[in-house]
């Protein structure tokens, strides 16, 4: 059991058969009355953020999250086929379970899947991926004077904003957490 005094940002706890990750927490000691811990937590399944207050003597169960390193093999239209890097077992992951990770998936990419009670709750991608530009407007001389950028479609179908000097065929490094252009590779 985890005491509220042991709360840390990023800690995962189980509340009502759901997994929550602590985003923020604050120990509050009012001048009058008992102390308490105010938290902001994200539901790992739904992504919803809730605020909850706990008594200082309250104890919570730690969430037993299993993480496995997998390799993305291919998409068969309805689901995404993965291979466990330790056991080499192949399995499928539904489009809903993949979430926003679909935008950055490239065949043979290594990623981490987190599961709770056998259900996938999170797909963790590398912080950056390298993807080729398949469609963008050509850069015109003098465009850079105004700054800004232009939209570009990547090989996975994701559309991001890139600087004017980027052309079709360029390989870019993209931050998967924010969806921002990092640099040309």
UniProtKB/Swiss-Prot annotation:
PROSITE patterns: EFP. It comes from the Bacteria. CDD domains: S1_EF-P_repeat_1, S1_EF-P_repeat_2. SUPFAM superfamilies: Nucleic acid-binding proteins, Translation proteins SH3-like domain. Its main location: cytoplasm. GO terms for molecular function: translation elongation factor activity. InterPro entries: Elong-fact-P_C, NA-bd_OB-fold, Rib_uL2_dom2, Transl_elong_fac_P/YeiP, Transl_elong_KOW-like, Transl_elong_P/YeiP_cen, Transl_elong_P/YeiP_CS, Transl_elongation_fac_P. It is found in: Cytoplasm. GO terms for biological process: peptide biosynthetic process. Coiled coil: none annotated. Keywords: Cytoplasm, Elongation factor, Protein biosynthesis. Pathway: Protein biosynthesis; polypeptide chain elongation. GO terms for cellular component: cytoplasm. Belongs to the elongation factor P family. HAMAP family: EF_P (MF_00141). Involved in peptide bond synthesis. Stimulates efficient translation and peptide-bond synthesis on native or reconstituted 70S ribosomes in vitro. Probably functions indirectly by altering the affinity of the ribosome for aminoacyl-tRNA, thus increasing their reactivity as acceptors for peptidyl transferase. This is Elongation factor P. It comes from Desulforamulus reducens (strain ATCC BAA-1160 / DSM 100696 / MI-1). The lineage of its organism: Bacteria, Bacillati, Bacillota, Clostridia, Eubacteriales. The gene is efp.
């Amino acid at each position: 059991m985890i005491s509220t005094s042991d709360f840390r940002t990023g800690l995962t706890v189980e509340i009502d058969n759901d997994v929550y990750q602590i985003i923020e927490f604050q120990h509050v000691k009012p001048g009058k009355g008992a102390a308490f811990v105010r938290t902001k937590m994200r539901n790992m399944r739904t992504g919803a953020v809730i605020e909850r207050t706990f008594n200082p003597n309250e104890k919570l169960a730690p969430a037993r999250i299993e993480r496995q390193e997998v390799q993305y093999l291919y998409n068969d239209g309805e689901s995404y086929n993965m291979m466990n890097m330790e056991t080499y077992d192949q399995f499928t992951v539904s489009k809903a379970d993949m979430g926003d990770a679909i935008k950055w998936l490239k065949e043979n990419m290594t990623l981490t899947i987190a599961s709770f009670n056998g259900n996938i709750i999170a797909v963790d991608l590398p912080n950056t991926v390298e993807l080729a530009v398949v469609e963008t407007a050509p850069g015109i001389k003098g465009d850079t004077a105004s700054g800004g950028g232009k939209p570009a479609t990547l090989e996975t179908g994701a559309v991001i904003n890139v600087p004017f000097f980027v052309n079709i065929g360029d390989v870019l490094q993209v931050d998967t957490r924010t969806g921002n252009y990092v640099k040309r590779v």
